[in-house]
Amino acid sequence: MTDKIRTLQGRVLSNKMDKSITVAIERKVKHPLYGKFIKRTTKIHAHDETNQCNAGDIVTIRECRPLSKTKSWTLVEVVTKA
């Protein structure tokens, strides 16, 4: 069985933790009654081994094994610097 590793792209909200970042993932959801598209954000904690990210950076993260209670994503690359 081959599972595709999930990758997401988002904006770094916080890098105050050591070797960890908080990434905001934005998605658009259609309102069930009115049909308007609404922005929804999900905050994900990710592992940043080299502490290279700053707040405002656009990054790519991928899913991995659980690294702590809240971290199960790791940094792949920094797409654009803030």
Curated annotation (Swiss-Prot):
GO cellular component: cytosolic small ribosomal subunit
GO biological process, one term: translation
Protein name: Small ribosomal subunit protein uS17
GO MF term list: rRNA binding; structural constituent of ribosome
Organism: Shewanella loihica (strain ATCC BAA-1088 / PV-4)
UniProt function note: One of the primary rRNA binding proteins, it binds specifically to the 5'-end of 16S ribosomal RNA.
Alphabetical list of HAMAP family matching this protein: Ribosomal_uS17_B (MF_01345_B)
Record family assignment: Belongs to the universal ribosomal protein uS17 family.
Assembly: Part of the 30S ribosomal subunit.
A Pfam family matched in the record: Ribosomal_S17
UniProt keyword terms in alphabetical order: Ribonucleoprotein, Ribosomal protein, RNA-binding, rRNA-binding
Gene3D superfamilies, alphabetized: Nucleic acid-binding proteins
